[in-house]
């Protein structure tokens, strides 16, 4: 949760009503909390079949994690999953704030990055604590 909020806060999103939440660290944390609370309510109210994935698992155990995602989606394994950068480059223009990262190898520098900003984030950790505990961070 802390890395997710920090990443959203640090992105250069095109400003609109939704993205205005990411101009302030506390607003970013509150939005994360609200979205997770809503997701939890949906899970209780509806029969939702979903696959939960941690970014860290993709980074540190790519093949196993992607294999489980493909299995969930009832898709066969293909070694092409290792060539995601090539696929992204062949798509042409990518319209996301992280467009430059899509064509690069998966990297781990974002994992635990929030700890470098721990002092700045100390006020929002209590907002995120329920999710830190729930997701075992």
Q: How would you describe each model-predicted region?
A:
Residues 2:
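Acidic, glycine-rich loop-and-beta core segments that form the ion-binding/anion-interacting portion
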Residues 5-52, 60-137:
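PAPS-dependent sulfotransferases, especially Golgi type II membrane carbohydrate sulfotransferases
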